């Protein structure tokens, strides 16, 4: 069945392969040629021809469903209809649909996901841009700083005209302009022990781009208590680190790796030591990729 037919409904558990890609993809879907296959289409004609094509490829145990999906539905059998997308969404996310690991089901998961960015700075900027571009449905941003001219070397959600304005509102304007489909929630305050649990509880994933150790430990502790995964990254001069902390999933947390913070002044900040601007883009892109992997369920997270 073709994509538009599949969107209208399908038999739960069925593998979707368009007729035009059948010969190219069948070995990925059914690697063993003695596997029983029941092919179905809308009315039973194309599936009959598809069955003949499969037999020519060595798949001998193939049958065509008489009457196809239409008859199945008319008989009252179970059907499933996924999240319906607008014409604009179908075009915007079309490159995701071509990826077997994402497809329309994966895109629907992205649209339903809620992710919060801790910081709208060097890491939060590129991560936020890619999360918005890929269609993460709800993005929260928590930061209390204002845009400074020195930020513009790396914090790409901000610009000259926004110097002196709220980073959260600047980031919201940029992400909304990139993808109006996304709901951006502003948290224009510093995350601390009085609000961390409350602000994080409504999100699926926490993206940590904090630039100080007290906040990193605070975010970690709240995530552990709430059972939320953290997609974490840090940068220093020309070096970057990225990982996923998912204690609820059986993985370690930030405190497992670093039980105690370094003594004050031992690790200089970007303000004191400097940082390569483009490095933020590299690490932020890794964070966005890890978020997508957690939401959709493809690949192995960097745990």
Language-model-detected regions and their locations in the chain:
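Adenine nucleotide-associated cytosolic modules
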Residues: 19, 33, 56, 74, ...
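Glycine-rich, N-terminal phosphate-binding loop of Rossmann-like dinucleotide-binding domains
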Residues: 1, 41, 209-211
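Short, compositionally biased "basic patch" segments
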Residues: 1-5, 164-167
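Rhodanese-like catalytic fold shared by cysteine-dependent sulfurtransferases
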Residues: 3-105
């Amino acid at each position: 069945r073709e994509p538009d037919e599949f969107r209208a409904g399908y038999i739960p558990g069925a593998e979707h392969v368009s007729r035009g890609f059948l010969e190219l993809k069948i070995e990925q879907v059914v690697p063993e040629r003695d596997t029983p296959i029941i092919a179905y289409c809308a009315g039973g004609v194309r599936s009959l021809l598809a069955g003949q094509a499969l037999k020519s490829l060595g798949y001998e145990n193939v049958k065509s469903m008489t009457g196809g999906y239409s008859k199945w539905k008319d008989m009252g059998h179970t059907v499933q209809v996924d999240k319906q997308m607008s014409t604009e969404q179908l075009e915007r996310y079309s490159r995701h649909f071509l990826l077997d690991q994402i497809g329309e089901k994966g895109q629907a998961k992205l649209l339903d996901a809620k992710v919060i960015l801790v910081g709208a700075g060097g890491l939060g900027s590129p991560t936020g841009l890619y999360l918005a571009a890929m269609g993460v449905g709800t993005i929260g941003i928590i930061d209390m700083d204002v845009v400074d001219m020195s930020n513009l070397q790396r914090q790409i959600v901000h610009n000259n005209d926004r110097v002196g304005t709220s980073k959260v509102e600047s980031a919201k304007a940029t992400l909304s302009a990139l993808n109006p489909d996304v709901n951006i929630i502003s948290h224009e305050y510093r995350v601390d022990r009085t609000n961390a649990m409350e602000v994080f509880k409504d999100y699926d994933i926490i993206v940590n781009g904090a630039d100080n150790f007290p906040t990193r430990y605070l975010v970690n502790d709240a995530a552990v208590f709430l059972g939320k995964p953290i997609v974490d990254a840090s940068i220093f001069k020309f070096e970057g680190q990225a990982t996923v902390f998912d204690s609820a999933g059986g993985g370690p947390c930030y405190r497992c790796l670093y039980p105690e913070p370094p003594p004050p002044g031992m690790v200089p900040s970007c303000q004191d030591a400097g940082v390569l601007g483009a490095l933020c883009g590299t690490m932020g892109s890794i964070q966005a990729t890890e978020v997508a992997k957690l939401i959709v369920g493809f690949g192995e997270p960097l745990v």
